[in-house]
Amino acid sequence: MTAQTLYDKLWNNHVVREEEDGTVLLYIDRHLVHEVTSPQAFEGLKMAGRKLWRIDSVVSTADHNTPTGDWDKGIQDPISKLQVDILDKNIKEFGALAYFPFMDKGQGIVHVMGPEQGATLPGMTVVCGDSHTSTHGAFGALAHGIGTSEVEHTMATQCITAKKSKSMLIAVDGKLKAGVTAKDVALYIIGQIGTAGGTGYAIEFGGEAIRSLSMEGRMTLCNMAIEAGARSGMVAVDQTTIDYVKDKPFAPKGEAWDKAVEYWRTLVSDEGAVFDKEYRFNAEDIEPQVTWGTSPEMVLDISSKVPNPAEETDPVKRSGMERALEYMGLEAGTPLNEIPVDIVFIGSCTNSRIEDLREAAAIAKDRKKAANVQRVLIVPGSGLVKEQAEKEGLDKIFIEAGFEWREPGCSMCLAMNADRLTPGQRCASTSNRNFEGRQGNGGRTHLVSPAMAAAAAVTGRFTDIRMMA
């Protein structure tokens, strides 16, 4: 039998039918639903007189529009409130395996809530009307975002039409240095291959450095696969995966668990499996990263300087660099560790889990917010993450440092709720996109790890965390 990649196995196990041109009907195991991309899909079902094909495949929460402060005031923005209210109504009418509404303890960012509930399991196909659905590939699952029309198709038929991507292996060999996190690995990879480097591919991440990551670190890495242009990212199943899933609310139990684990252990690329493209990186080459421009690929080590467009020979790239520097208000040659920040945001589906908050708290402990930093928002990814952080006293560390301890939600990752930048504000952010206006009109976003964000909060500028005792 021909050796298969992990992607081959996941794909082949879910093909319902294949056409001559390679288009397939792909069966979907788990459908994650939130308030932004579902209203039109539910309306389409109503107009056609259809029901959900499989109610028990749907797990839902409200996240993009929910406020992260003053919950006693409810949702103030009328459009945001309308979207959340419509989701409440649609789930009540159509049903779901589980729904975590606004202000429920289980509510949170969909890509945080799903894994912590055990709704994401190895071997599954997972879709959501959100591009960062690639997060769930960390479990040895095939996960990717879909558009609103595909959300309706999944609801109505439990299938989507798709064509198989090419396969890519990105291996990071060796051990990561102290202070280097999964976020740094993700940004480094994107800096090396570019935001189009993974276009048309499904990426499997491997190598010693990847295997050493916790599940939360792997989720951060796979979350960023879409920023490298890939539709999906994944990590093979190992004991770390199995230990994380065990005893989660929706994980199999008893004999079903034993059978599931037996299957899950096969979800690795076979020896001799051939990938369409491979990259290998040395973990020791990776330093703490900071983006300087308006694309995740515009990223450098913290010890670097803002690049000079005049040194770029490609006229298209040079023009892009010039535009980015103008938007970001930066001068070529400025050391990254001399760039001051106005706002710090620690949260998002990339970096809002308990390990991320511990990482930030370790830097913030016994320190205070720098005088030039206007606000520091700490936004846990879910109510359960918030609860755990408070049990550990992390909230007190943040509050004593002068940071804001918020309620769960997508928050300042994107300007769809009350948390947003104003024109010209510079933000050290643990989110996934630094596009123009992503965090608010005219806002300037620098992507970093939680520890690097916390360091910027207490020093007032981008700082190498390895220099902080």
UniProtKB/Swiss-Prot annotation:
According to the record, cofactor stoichiometry and binding are noted as: Binds 1 [4Fe-4S] cluster per subunit.
This protein's cofactor list reads:
[4Fe-4S] cluster
**Pathway, per Swiss-Prot/TrEMBL?**
Amino-acid biosynthesis; L-leucine biosynthesis; L-leucine from 3-methyl-2-oxobutanoate: step 2/4
**What's one GO BP annotation on this UniProt entry?**
L-leucine biosynthetic process
Q: Which residues bind [4Fe-4S] cluster?
A: 349, 410, 413
EC number(s)?
4.2.1.33
- Can you state which reaction this protein catalyses? (2R,3S)-3-isopropylmalate = (2S)-2-isopropylmalate
User: Keyword set for this entry?
Assistant: 4Fe-4S, Amino-acid biosynthesis, Branched-chain amino acid biosynthesis, Iron, Iron-sulfur, Leucine biosynthesis, Lyase, Metal-binding
Q: Which GO terms describe its molecular function?
A: 3-isopropylmalate dehydratase activity; 4 iron, 4 sulfur cluster binding; metal ion binding
HAMAP family from the entry? LeuC_type1 (MF_01026)
Role played: Catalyzes the isomerization between 2-isopropylmalate and 3-isopropylmalate, via the formation of 2-isopropylmaleate.
What does the similarity note say?
Belongs to the aconitase/IPM isomerase family. LeuC type 1 subfamily.
Q: Cite the record's note on assembly.
A: Heterodimer of LeuC and LeuD.
Name-wise, this protein is 3-isopropylmalate dehydratase large subunit
Q: Which species is the source of this protein?
A: Neisseria meningitidis serogroup C (strain 053442)
